[in-house]
Amino acid sequence: LAICDEGRTAPLLVEPPRGVWSRTDILHWLHDRADDSLLVGFDFSFSAPFLDRCAYLPGETDATDPRALWAYVDRHSSDADLGAASFLETRRGRHFYLGAADGVKAHFMHYRRCEQHFNANGGGKASTVYDAIGAAQVAKASFAGMRLLHHLDPAIPVWPIDPPPRRGACVVEIYTTIAARAAGIRKGLSKLRDGEALDLALAAMGSDPHLPMPRYTDHATDAILTAAWLRTNARRDDLWHPPAMTRQIARTEGWTFGVS
């Protein structure tokens, strides 16, 4: 978790209350700041694909909007700390691909409109939440994140399912690769693993150098750089109203802030 104010000062890491951040800790931290002028970026998918098949989990739930999906996932997940690994495991081969025993992987490769648009326009290779295997998979974090959003609701609006509020906090979906590309980091080299590389990326965001850290991890540098990127782009109207995002897409699948 990294946070910054307006201006140029580099984002700072926020110390967790108990050694490492849990989802529950993040949930409580956000509830305490719901009335603050805060733009919050989460790096996970806020919804599963809906429009291609008119269902999130065909044959299982009749949910037609992300909030109904979040509630369904939460109701059918018993994992600690808002986890969702069991939700995926009990549905492997039916909705999720976790390995060769689940069948032909291509049959699970359904994408949201936002991911299709991002991939088709050279942004990279955004993953689908139905693919739950490999280092690039986003399924486990995304369905766990949906549980977090369910418990956060209705304290903080979630864009673009909700319009941006006139005051108070707002949550958006982010993709750290977008921030890395904006900082001039080439494809395949998105991770920053030392202070010098982080400062070069921050400079591209109009930010001052960061305070040195005892150790550099992908999670820490991603959080710092993406917080700076959000600050730089928070007032860009084209990112709040991307031409490819229709009202139907926003209502059923959401969108990633930064995909234009």
Model features per residue range: what roles?
Residues 1-39, 44-260:
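RNase H-like (RuvC/DEDD) metal-dependent nuclease/polynucleotide-processing core
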